[in-house]
Amino acid sequence: IVGGTAADISQFPHQLSLQTT
């Protein structure tokens, strides 16, 4: 997942280390 939307963060917390919005 690229973008780090609220829904993405909820499902993929590891995305926080890649990109946060």
Curated annotation (Swiss-Prot):
GO terms for molecular function: serine-type endopeptidase activity. Transmembrane segments: none annotated. It catalyses: Preferential cleavage: Arg-|-Xaa, Lys-|-Xaa. It comes from Apis mellifera scutellata (Africanized honey bee). GO terms for biological process: digestion; proteolysis. It is found in: Secreted, Extracellular space. The keyword Cell membrane does not apply. This is Trypsin.
